[in-house]
């Protein structure tokens, strides 16, 4: 979902280097040094306005979180949430999800989240979907053996495509929810998008998958 260009967004990010890693390639292989501890590292690709990553960081202070989004204005809103929450265990990156191996060593990330990714519904755009096999190649490299992906969407077509993509890649579909908010699943942290559309009755799909 595109967000209107925000005036001063670039300066906002540049003025907060404690949270926004401006040269993430320099952190490759040393993310524990960046955080100053050896706690697990979880990343969210397509972190949007930061509601999920901030909520997870508040809920799990013993885990380090990295929110990743390519959109400048969106990431600046995520920074607002991080600053307001004063969470010490969050960093933000403005990079593309296809280039993660430039910023993380093999096995350096413990878990990753894909929340409400662009569905790219046209067949000619299949390679842009974040659950396309080329993206899975990248994720597999930066995650440990049997690394885990948690995926949420409100788009039934993307969900079915992603289940098939995970399965064809040889991943294990550990748990599947066809209506997350109607289930007994506890501990769900919502994104801004999820909260908005679930309040309108939109069904939310979720899967946990392992390599």
From Swiss-Prot:
It comes from the Bacteria. Pfam families: Methyltransf_4. InterPro entries: SAM-dependent_MTases_sf, tRNA_(Gua-N-7)_MeTrfase_Trmb, tRNA_methyltr_TrmB_bact. Pathway: tRNA modification; N(7)-methylguanine-tRNA biosynthesis. S-adenosyl-L-methionine binds at residues 44, 69, 96, 118. The keyword DNA damage does not apply. HAMAP family: tRNA_methyltr_TrmB (MF_01057). Belongs to the class I-like SAM-binding methyltransferase superfamily. TrmB family. This is tRNA (guanine-N(7)-)-methyltransferase. It comes from Streptococcus pyogenes serotype M1. The gene is trmB.
